[in-house]
Amino acid sequence: IFNFEGGCYAKVIDLTEEKEPDIYRAIRPGALLENVVFKKGTKEVDYFDSSITQNTRVSYPIDHIDNIQVPSYASNPKHIFFLTCDAFGVLPPVSKLTPGQAAYHFISGYTAKVAGTEAGITEPVPSFSACFGEPFMPLHPAVYAEMLSKKMREAGVSVWLVNTGWSGGPYGVGSRIKLKYTRAMISAILEGKLDDVDYETHPIFGLFMPKYCPGVPTELLDPMNTWLQKGAYVSKAIQLAHSFHINFDKFASQASEEIMKGGPLIDSHHSLNEHI
Protein backbone atom coordinates (compact mmCIF):
# COMPACT_ATOMS: atom_id res chain seq x y z
CA ILE A 1 0.00 0.00 0.00
CA PHE A 2 1.51 3.33 -1.04
CA ASN A 3 -1.17 5.85 -0.19
CA PHE A 4 -4.90 6.35 0.09
CA GLU A 5 -6.74 8.29 -2.60
CA GLY A 6 -10.20 8.38 -4.08
CA GLY A 7 -8.74 8.44 -7.57
CA CYS A 8 -5.94 10.07 -9.53
CA TYR A 9 -5.31 13.27 -11.48
CA ALA A 10 -2.34 12.59 -13.76
CA LYS A 11 -0.51 14.35 -16.58
CA VAL A 12 -0.84 12.57 -19.92
CA ILE A 13 1.45 14.56 -22.21
CA ASP A 14 3.59 12.09 -24.21
CA LEU A 15 1.82 9.20 -22.47
CA THR A 16 2.58 5.69 -23.71
CA GLU A 17 1.55 2.31 -22.39
CA GLU A 18 5.22 1.38 -22.01
CA LYS A 19 6.10 4.38 -19.85
CA GLU A 20 2.94 4.52 -17.72
CA PRO A 21 0.99 1.26 -18.11
CA ASP A 22 -1.38 1.81 -15.17
CA ILE A 23 -2.39 5.32 -16.21
CA TYR A 24 -2.67 4.34 -19.87
CA ARG A 25 -4.98 1.41 -19.10
CA ALA A 26 -7.04 3.47 -16.67
CA ILE A 27 -8.18 5.73 -19.52
CA ARG A 28 -11.46 4.09 -20.39
CA PRO A 29 -15.16 4.96 -19.96
CA GLY A 30 -15.52 6.69 -16.60
CA ALA A 31 -12.24 8.61 -16.91
CA LEU A 32 -12.17 12.32 -17.75
CA LEU A 33 -9.53 13.75 -20.10
CA GLU A 34 -8.67 17.47 -20.11
CA ASN A 35 -6.99 19.64 -22.76
CA VAL A 36 -6.21 16.73 -25.09
CA VAL A 37 -6.52 16.63 -28.88
CA PHE A 38 -7.91 13.85 -31.06
CA LYS A 39 -6.03 12.56 -34.06
CA LYS A 40 -7.63 14.17 -37.09
CA GLY A 41 -10.78 12.40 -38.26
CA THR A 42 -10.73 9.89 -35.38
CA LYS A 43 -11.76 9.47 -31.76
CA GLU A 44 -8.22 8.43 -30.83
CA VAL A 45 -6.38 10.78 -28.47
CA ASP A 46 -3.02 12.13 -29.61
CA TYR A 47 -1.08 12.24 -26.35
CA PHE A 48 1.88 13.89 -28.08
CA ASP A 49 -0.13 16.93 -29.23
CA SER A 50 0.57 19.92 -26.98
CA SER A 51 -1.03 22.52 -29.27
CA ILE A 52 -3.47 23.56 -26.53
CA THR A 53 -1.15 23.14 -23.54
CA GLN A 54 1.55 20.89 -22.12
CA ASN A 55 -0.71 20.43 -19.12
CA THR A 56 -2.93 17.64 -20.47
CA ARG A 57 -4.59 15.58 -17.74
CA VAL A 58 -6.76 12.63 -16.88
CA SER A 59 -8.93 12.03 -13.82
CA TYR A 60 -9.95 8.46 -13.12
CA PRO A 61 -11.61 6.59 -10.24
CA ILE A 62 -9.51 4.40 -7.98
CA ASP A 63 -11.10 1.19 -9.25
CA HIS A 64 -9.63 1.80 -12.72
CA ILE A 65 -6.30 0.46 -11.50
CA ASP A 66 -5.27 -2.85 -9.98
CA ASN A 67 -3.75 -3.56 -6.56
CA ILE A 68 -5.97 -1.20 -4.61
CA GLN A 69 -6.73 -1.46 -0.90
CA VAL A 70 -10.43 -1.73 -0.06
CA PRO A 71 -11.41 -0.28 2.36
CA SER A 72 -8.80 2.46 2.55
CA TYR A 73 -7.05 1.89 5.86
CA ALA A 74 -4.02 -0.01 7.15
CA SER A 75 -1.54 -0.28 10.02
CA ASN A 76 1.50 1.99 10.52
CA PRO A 77 3.68 2.36 7.42
CA LYS A 78 7.18 0.90 7.32
CA HIS A 79 8.44 3.52 4.88
CA ILE A 80 7.47 7.08 3.98
CA PHE A 81 8.46 8.48 0.59
CA PHE A 82 8.77 12.20 -0.06
CA LEU A 83 8.53 12.78 -3.81
CA THR A 84 10.21 15.74 -5.44
CA CYS A 85 10.81 16.67 -9.06
CA ASP A 86 14.13 18.49 -9.02
CA ALA A 87 14.46 20.18 -12.41
CA PHE A 88 17.97 21.42 -11.55
CA GLY A 89 19.53 17.94 -11.64
CA VAL A 90 20.99 18.39 -8.15
CA LEU A 91 19.24 16.04 -5.72
CA PRO A 92 20.02 12.30 -5.67
CA PRO A 93 17.38 9.99 -7.17
CA VAL A 94 16.99 8.38 -3.74
CA SER A 95 18.34 9.22 -0.30
CA LYS A 96 17.60 8.07 3.24
CA LEU A 97 16.67 10.79 5.72
CA THR A 98 17.36 11.13 9.43
CA PRO A 99 14.40 12.30 11.58
CA GLY A 100 15.83 15.84 11.49
CA GLN A 101 16.27 15.77 7.72
CA ALA A 102 12.79 14.32 7.29
CA ALA A 103 11.31 17.16 9.33
CA TYR A 104 13.33 19.79 7.44
CA HIS A 105 12.35 18.50 4.01
CA PHE A 106 8.75 18.02 5.14
CA ILE A 107 8.60 21.66 6.19
CA SER A 108 10.32 22.75 2.97
CA GLY A 109 8.07 20.77 0.61
CA TYR A 110 10.43 21.35 -2.30
CA THR A 111 9.76 20.65 -5.96
CA ALA A 112 10.39 22.66 -9.13
CA LYS A 113 8.12 24.21 -11.70
CA VAL A 114 9.07 23.48 -15.29
CA ALA A 115 7.79 24.60 -18.68
CA GLY A 116 4.24 23.42 -19.20
CA THR A 117 3.15 23.33 -15.56
CA GLU A 118 2.11 26.98 -15.41
CA ALA A 119 1.66 29.77 -17.92
CA GLY A 120 4.80 31.86 -18.34
CA ILE A 121 7.20 29.26 -16.93
CA THR A 122 10.02 28.71 -19.44
CA GLU A 123 12.92 27.88 -17.09
CA PRO A 124 12.98 25.77 -13.91
CA VAL A 125 11.82 27.65 -10.82
CA PRO A 126 12.20 26.31 -7.25
CA SER A 127 8.84 25.82 -5.58
CA PHE A 128 8.27 25.30 -1.86
CA SER A 129 4.96 24.28 -0.28
CA ALA A 130 5.25 23.60 3.44
CA CYS A 131 4.38 20.01 4.38
CA PHE A 132 3.82 19.39 0.64
CA GLY A 133 0.39 21.01 1.05
CA GLU A 134 0.74 24.45 2.64
CA PRO A 135 -2.80 25.75 1.90
CA PHE A 136 -4.30 22.91 3.93
CA MET A 137 -2.14 23.25 7.06
CA PRO A 138 -3.65 25.69 9.61
CA LEU A 139 -0.87 25.32 12.21
CA HIS A 140 2.79 26.27 11.94
CA PRO A 141 4.60 23.69 9.76
CA ALA A 142 7.05 22.94 12.59
CA VAL A 143 4.15 21.48 14.59
CA TYR A 144 3.47 18.90 11.89
CA ALA A 145 7.18 18.24 11.43
CA GLU A 146 7.63 17.48 15.13
CA MET A 147 4.62 15.16 14.96
CA LEU A 148 6.21 13.38 12.01
CA SER A 149 9.55 12.96 13.79
CA LYS A 150 7.82 11.64 16.92
CA LYS A 151 5.80 9.09 14.99
CA MET A 152 8.85 8.05 12.98
CA ARG A 153 10.68 7.17 16.18
CA GLU A 154 7.70 5.47 17.83
CA ALA A 155 6.86 3.30 14.82
CA GLY A 156 10.40 2.78 13.52
CA VAL A 157 9.50 4.27 10.15
CA SER A 158 12.16 5.02 7.53
CA VAL A 159 11.77 8.17 5.44
CA TRP A 160 13.18 8.48 1.93
CA LEU A 161 13.51 11.42 -0.44
CA VAL A 162 12.85 10.25 -4.00
CA ASN A 163 13.71 12.59 -6.85
CA THR A 164 11.83 11.87 -10.07
CA GLY A 165 13.27 14.92 -11.82
CA TRP A 166 16.41 15.46 -13.88
CA SER A 167 19.84 13.84 -13.95
CA GLY A 168 23.01 14.78 -15.82
CA GLY A 169 22.13 18.46 -15.85
CA PRO A 170 19.17 20.78 -15.34
CA TYR A 171 15.98 20.80 -17.39
CA GLY A 172 16.94 21.38 -21.04
CA VAL A 173 20.39 19.80 -20.62
CA GLY A 174 20.01 16.60 -18.62
CA SER A 175 17.33 13.96 -18.94
CA ARG A 176 14.41 12.88 -16.78
CA ILE A 177 15.17 9.98 -14.45
CA LYS A 178 13.57 6.94 -16.04
CA LEU A 179 10.45 5.61 -14.37
CA LYS A 180 11.86 2.08 -14.39
CA TYR A 181 14.77 3.26 -12.23
CA THR A 182 12.48 5.00 -9.75
CA ARG A 183 10.39 1.84 -9.51
CA ALA A 184 13.52 -0.26 -9.02
CA MET A 185 14.58 1.99 -6.12
CA ILE A 186 11.16 1.82 -4.48
CA SER A 187 11.08 -1.97 -4.89
CA ALA A 188 14.57 -2.32 -3.42
CA ILE A 189 13.55 -0.30 -0.36
CA LEU A 190 10.35 -2.29 0.20
CA GLU A 191 12.26 -5.56 -0.15
CA GLY A 192 14.92 -4.47 2.34
CA LYS A 193 17.68 -4.48 -0.26
CA LEU A 194 18.97 -1.04 0.76
CA ASP A 195 19.17 -1.92 4.46
CA ASP A 196 22.75 -3.20 4.41
CA VAL A 197 24.36 -1.35 1.49
CA ASP A 198 26.99 1.33 1.97
CA TYR A 199 25.93 4.98 1.92
CA GLU A 200 27.82 8.18 1.21
CA THR A 201 26.95 11.69 2.31
CA HIS A 202 26.08 14.39 -0.20
CA PRO A 203 28.68 17.15 0.36
CA ILE A 204 26.20 20.02 0.14
CA PHE A 205 22.80 18.67 1.22
CA GLY A 206 24.06 16.08 3.72
CA LEU A 207 21.72 13.43 2.30
CA PHE A 208 22.63 9.75 2.62
CA MET A 209 22.93 8.25 -0.86
CA PRO A 210 23.13 4.46 -1.38
CA LYS A 211 26.22 3.36 -3.30
CA TYR A 212 24.33 0.43 -4.81
CA CYS A 213 20.75 -0.30 -5.75
CA PRO A 214 19.69 -3.36 -7.77
CA GLY A 215 18.33 -2.45 -11.18
CA VAL A 216 19.78 1.07 -11.16
CA PRO A 217 23.07 2.19 -12.82
CA THR A 218 25.55 2.94 -10.03
CA GLU A 219 26.63 6.26 -11.56
CA LEU A 220 23.03 7.53 -11.36
CA LEU A 221 22.93 7.26 -7.56
CA ASP A 222 25.37 10.15 -7.03
CA PRO A 223 24.06 13.06 -9.13
CA MET A 224 27.49 14.69 -9.44
CA ASN A 225 28.72 11.65 -11.38
CA THR A 226 26.12 12.25 -14.09
CA TRP A 227 27.26 15.79 -14.91
CA LEU A 228 30.03 16.35 -17.45
CA GLN A 229 31.35 19.37 -15.54
CA LYS A 230 31.63 18.77 -11.79
CA GLY A 231 32.13 22.47 -11.09
CA ALA A 232 28.87 23.30 -12.85
CA TYR A 233 27.10 20.71 -10.71
CA VAL A 234 28.50 22.12 -7.47
CA SER A 235 27.58 25.66 -8.49
CA LYS A 236 24.00 24.62 -9.24
CA ALA A 237 23.80 22.61 -5.99
CA ILE A 238 24.96 25.58 -3.91
CA GLN A 239 22.44 27.79 -5.71
CA LEU A 240 19.63 25.37 -4.84
CA ALA A 241 20.87 25.03 -1.25
CA HIS A 242 20.67 28.80 -0.85
CA SER A 243 17.08 28.69 -2.14
CA PHE A 244 16.32 26.19 0.62
CA HIS A 245 17.88 28.47 3.25
CA ILE A 246 16.00 31.54 2.03
CA ASN A 247 12.70 29.66 2.05
CA PHE A 248 13.31 28.20 5.51
CA ASP A 249 14.10 31.55 7.14
CA LYS A 250 10.41 32.15 7.84
CA PHE A 251 10.13 28.86 9.76
CA ALA A 252 13.44 28.94 11.63
CA SER A 253 12.16 30.72 14.77
CA GLN A 254 9.91 27.77 15.68
CA ALA A 255 12.09 24.93 14.38
CA SER A 256 14.16 22.83 16.79
CA GLU A 257 17.93 22.53 16.56
CA GLU A 258 17.55 18.99 15.20
CA ILE A 259 15.33 20.25 12.38
CA MET A 260 17.68 23.12 11.56
CA LYS A 261 20.57 20.65 11.27
CA GLY A 262 18.53 18.65 8.76
CA GLY A 263 19.02 21.25 6.03
CA PRO A 264 21.87 21.83 3.56
CA LEU A 265 25.33 21.79 5.10
CA ILE A 266 26.55 24.95 3.39
CA ASP A 267 25.91 28.57 4.24
CA SER A 268 26.40 31.77 2.28
CA HIS A 269 30.09 31.93 3.25
CA HIS A 270 31.07 28.59 1.69
CA SER A 271 33.09 28.79 -1.48
CA LEU A 272 32.65 26.71 -4.58
CA ASN A 273 36.15 25.21 -4.42
CA GLU A 274 35.49 23.58 -1.04
CA HIS A 275 33.11 21.11 -2.71
CA ILE A 276 34.86 20.27 -5.99
Predicted regions and their residues:
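Generic structural signal for alpha-helix starts
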Residues: 178, 217, 254-259, 267
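Terminal-proximal interaction/regulatory segments of ATP-powered molecular machines
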Residues: 174-176, 195, 267-276
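Glycine-rich, often acidic-flanked micro-motifs
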Residues: 1-226, 232, 239, 243-246
